[in-house]
Structures are given as C-alpha cells and as structure tokens.
Amino acid sequence: MTEEKAEEKNKMASVFLPALGGVAVCGGTHGNELSGVYLVQEMERQRKERGDGVWPIPVTTVLSNPRAVKECRRYIDTDMNRCFSKAVLSTPITDSSPYEVRRAQELNNLLGVKGSDDVMDMICDLHNTTSNMGLTLIHYSASDWVTLHICKYLQTKITKVPVRVLVLDFPINDAYNLESVSKHGFTLEVGPQPQGVVRADIYVIMKEAVDLTIDWIHKFNSGTVFEGGDVEVFKFIKSVDYPRDPETRNLTAAVHPQLQDRDFCLLKRGDPLFLSFSGETVTCEEEEPLHPFFINEGAYYEKGIAFHLAKKWTLTVPSVQVQTTNSA
Amino acid sequence: MTEEKAEEKNKMASVFLPALGGVAVCGGTHGNELSGVYLVQEMERQRKERGDGVWPIPVTTVLSNPRAVKECRRYIDTDMNRCFSKAVLSTPITDSSPYEVRRAQELNNLLGVKGSDDVMDMICDLHNTTSNMGLTLIHYSASDWVTLHICKYLQTKITKVPVRVLVLDFPINDAYNLESVSKHGFTLEVGPQPQGVVRADIYVIMKEAVDLTIDWIHKFNSGTVFEGGDVEVFKFIKSVDYPRDPETRNLTAAVHPQLQDRDFCLLKRGDPLFLSFSGETVTCEEEEPLHPFFINEGAYYEKGIAFHLAKKWTLTVPSVQVQTTNSA
C-alpha cells in the first residue's frame, strides 16, 4: 500500500467510542439568562406529563442556581460558572462560603465527581448573552470527537442563525465552567437576549439545539456512523476592556456602533472599537486581524471585558461510531 | 367677526407662558438603565471641564439612585419611579423605610417640593427599556403646552428613530414618576437596550434628545414663537400579563415572535400574542384594535405586565411664546 492510500484509509476509518449514557441539560447557571430556565422547566413539565419515555435517551434536567433564578440575578455571591475548577470544587465549605461555591460542590456530587469515572457522559449547559452571537457552542478541548461531532451536526441542521464553535483549550482541571464536570459536553450560548427577558425566537433556537443534541446521542448509540470532516472553530486569544477613567474606573466610552452586533467579524487595525461619551472614536491597534466575540456582553462590565478576541482555525475530525461487542 | 374667523384667530393667537428657569436632567432613577447614567456623568464631566456656561440655560444634573447604580440593579428595596406620589412623598421616614422612599423624599426636597411654587420648571428623567420603543416621551398631562411643544420639536428634529408621545393623563398628585415633581417635563425612554448594558446608538439618541430639549428651552426663553399644530399621542388604556401557571405563577409562554419588537403597531383581534414554551400560539381577543407598547420589557415581569395597550389620538396645541413685560 502506498503512503497516500494508507493516509486515505486512515481518514476513512471510524474511531469507535463507547455509547453515551445520556445528557444532563442544565439551565439557570446564571439566574437572569431566562431561555435556559424556561427550557428546563418546560422539559420537567413534559416529563411529568408524559414520563421518562418522552426522550429516547436518559435525560437529567437541572436548575443550576435556584436562588439566583428566584431573584432573577446572575448570581447571589459569586459567578457560579467560574466555580467548577478542581481547586474551587475541593475548597472546604465553611459558614462563610459563597452560596455558589456550595451549590457548585452539590452539582459536582450530583453530576460528577469531576475527573472520576462516574461523571455524566455529557452536560449541555444553557446560557444567554446580550451579544449578537447567534448560537455558540463553547467547550474545552480540540480533540473531543463526540462534542465536535455534535457541534458539526448542529451546524448542519440549524439554519436560522449562525452556529459557531469556540474552543477554550485549557487543561480540564483548570476549566471552571459547569460543563467541564462531564466527559463531553458544551456551554450553549444563544443571543442576543437581554438579561431578565425571554425572547421566543431565542428560546426556540435553544430548544432546537437541545433536541438535536438528544437526537445525535440517540442516533450514535443506535449505530449511526457519523462521517468525519473539517470543523471550523474559534480559539480564544485575549480579552479587551473598555476605555475607563483612570481614577473612578468608570467607562468613558461604549462599543462603537460599527462594531456593536458584529460578533465574529474580522477586526483589523484601524477599525472603530469604541465611541467615547463625548463623541470620539477609538480604533483597533492590533497587529493581527482577529475575530471579536461577546461584544458588549452585559455580565462582563464587572469583569473588565468589552469583548474577547479569537483566531479561526480548522479542525479535522475523524468519523465516529459506537463501540459494540464486535468492534471493542 | 364671524364665528369661523374668531375660531381662526383663536387658533393663530399665541399662548403667552412664563420663561423657564432651566431643566433638571436625571439619570439612574433605575440603576441598570445605563444610557442615562453615562449621560449624566458625561454632562457632569463637561461642567467640570468647561464651567456652567457649557449650556445656555441653567442645567441641574442628578444621579437619582446612586446605590442602585453602584450595584447595577433597577432598585435596592423598591422601584423608586413609583415613589413620587403625594402619598409616598409624605410618608414618615422610619428605620425600616425602603431606601428608595428615603431617596425620593430627598429628591423631592432638592427638585420640589412637589405641588409647591418652588418646584423645578422641568425635569427630564432618562430611562432605557428592553422594548423596541425608539424614543418615547412619557408625561402626565394632555394640556401642558410646554411639554407637548418640546415633544413636537423632538419629533421634528430626530429622524434616526421614531419619536412617540405617551400620555398617562391622571391626576398629578397620584402621579408616581420622578418627572411629576416638576411643573413640566417628561420621562425619556429609549430602547431597545438590555439592562446593565450601554449601546452607543441608544446613548447617542438620548444625548440628542437632551441637547434638543435644552435648545428648545433656550429658544423659547429668547422669544422664539413656536407654531401650534397637531401632536399625535398615545394614551394608556390597560396592561396585559403573560400566560402563567395557575399554581406556580411561572410564565408558560413568551411574547410571540410576530409581536416582539413591534411596539406601537396596531394589534387586532386574532393577531398572535404569545408562543407557549411547548409551541402553541395564543391570539389577541380584544374587541377594539389597540397599540401595544413596552412589549416584553424586562423590568415588568415582576409587575405582571407583558405589554401595555394604548389608543392613538390627536392633540391640538396652540402656538406658544414667552411672556414678557409687554405681553404679561
């Protein structure tokens, strides 16, 4: 066999992977991101009405931060979606522990324990953003074929809005998002939607993405071969803050109207970034063209982030199919 | 003189009104409506840099709810923009009084006292809404010629977004909004903008409206005659709540995609109102066609309001000019 043919054969060969036990669908990790809150409540209503058989695979539904949901706030004491690193999950709990640290450890026991063999196969954590990001799937690894195949599937099936994949690509123990507790999975961001508001159009897109994820897992477990190919992903590079008053730290400018709502565009040196409150334009000074995202996300003002920047690259994923007694 | 001619003469005659002492521009009455917060801060920066002469009339700037602004929340204890009725303003203050009741009484002493001769001539209270309401001027009286003339002026001058006038038309003593403290004035609503976010496009529109208000007062005080004519206004009729679960009171539906973002359209019997979280459409059952506004406003979920309904009517305002020694 020539080298070329061997490579071709290698490309075509399926990677055999274990069947997936099911999925945990989590909403309200941030209590004021309402599409996920109402979707989880709707799924729980469906289960009550029609029993577990409503889905073809085991589905766990979780309202992640019930106290924040009740108060319609992002969080009570601290951002829970920064509490799922190994370090925070192993912090001893005391009377003064933030509510979200306690709740994160509870969720880790329910869905994990992170890093152990018993963790959930997949978490799909539902979020909204005030940014015009369409449907964005965020996850931690550039080599998790199951997750990347689901992303690819959603990209093929959802046509109403752009579906993009964002890879953070840092060690899983340092990963601080809820979905990092499970073997596979992703954060599902849908926007634009204001905090404390549910928009039917955004809710419908989120529901379609969750239904398709369940659909993919069912098909995979049933033996469907998912063909490999290229997946275009965005990789986080750096964050950019708003211009601020050096003394008060108050913002002195807003995102420029020419950048607002243009998440994932190609931002080049000289392009407008900010419009100051007195009317001056601040332009981009980056040497390399990059893709901005989470542009003017409401929750990031306090984090000192006006937007993130990403680089686009292409991942090649192999074909995958479920491991059976014969294939194992 | 015939009756017709007398009527004609009456129409043409100017109403002479006292010069206006200035305007109070208030932002952050709701702490997470950021355009007004940043506009007031910018005006204060300009005054610091260039002195009081920066405006041709006396301008007072007020950050109405500084604690809520600091926490980026609508309010701390209670909605302050419901605290300016005579009843709440005269409630005795105790240790357990809500922060906003105390602050409303402070503001009433600063800008009022409501109902007395010493009140500010005009308050312009800056707000944002998550609804697609463009620029909406809200005020209490259908016969306040000064305010209606400023509305008319803004309608003529601002072309980027629709400028609409909403009249609540109930007794001034019961009126609970901050602007009701002054002789004239209005609440200036600009949207759509998420809570906790400032969008440059929305900020620029709000700034233009405030600049034009100052401009109108200056021209009026300088003797300009403002010609009378018709002003189209919307009058509040009733509120409509979301469909809710009878037990939990949770929402069971969101505003329908065909209604979302269509504030001030004409809503007729049979038009879609809501889309339930399981996919069913709820339609309008009103006998009379009406105009919905504040559609899906984030702050109104807790108030049990999915949208308000209004009726459109036309007000005829007379020409106005400033009272001088000669004319008085």
UniProtKB/Swiss-Prot annotation, chains A, B:
Q: So what does this thing catalyse? A: an N-acyl-aromatic L-alpha-amino acid + H2O = an aromatic L-alpha-amino acid + a carboxylate; an N-acetyl-L-cysteine-S-conjugate + H2O = an S-substituted L-cysteine + acetate
Source species, domain of life? Eukaryota
Which cellular compartments is it found in?
Apical cell membrane; Cytoplasm
Listed Pfam families: AstE_AspA_cat, AstE_AspA_hybrid
Listed A to Z, the keywords are: Cell membrane, Cytoplasm, Hydrolase, Membrane, Metal-binding, Zinc
Where do the annotations place substrate binding? 74, 81-82, 189, 300
Q: Give the bilayer topology.
A: Peripheral membrane protein
This enzyme's EC code(s):
3.5.1.114
Note describing how the cofactor binds: Binds 1 zinc ion per subunit.
Q: Into which family does the record put it? A: Belongs to the AspA/AstE family. Aspartoacylase subfamily.
Q: How does it assemble?
A: Homotetramer.
What this protein is reported to do is described as: Plays an important role in deacetylating mercapturic acids in kidney proximal tubules.
HAMAP family in the record: Aspartoacylase
> What is the name of the protein in this document?
N-acyl-aromatic-L-amino acid amidohydrolase (carboxylate-forming) A
